[in-house]
Regions:
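Short alpha-helix capping/helix-loop boundary micro-motifs
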Residues: 29, 72-79
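Long, compositionally biased stretches
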Residues: 1-67, 84-97
Length: 97
């Protein structure tokens, strides 16, 4: 398991699928960093904790490579007062379960 702390700022993106979901891009090569494509993580969005997964939802980077994302729940967006288009600070560490 990778114990590295990943920390970055990102713009909240609006999902084009579903009912108004939102996400941030994970700007690292997930397979190179973790050795797999889906990674369970402890994350924080502007300090608000969240347990979820970094996943491939079929989104592509401009160069055509796979874009991995981390979803942001509406409840968390409400707590931190941020919506799609806003910049947030994210911390991520891998979790076992």
């Amino acid at each position: 398991m990778n114990k590295k702390l990943y920390e970055y700022d990102a713009i909240i993106q609006l999902s084009e699928v579903g009912k108004g979901g939102a996400y941030v891009v994970f700007p690292y090569d997930v397979r190179a960093e973790f050795g797999k494509g889906r990674v369970k993580v402890h994350a924080a969005f502007d300090g608000e904790p969240y347990d979820g997964s970094i996943v491939n939802m079929g989104i592509k980077n401009p160069d055509g490579s796979v874009c991995y994302i981390l979803g942001i729940l509406k409840d968390i967006r409400k707590k931190i007062g941020k919506q799609p288009g806003d910049i947030i600070h994210i911390t991520v560490t891998e979790r076992e379960n």
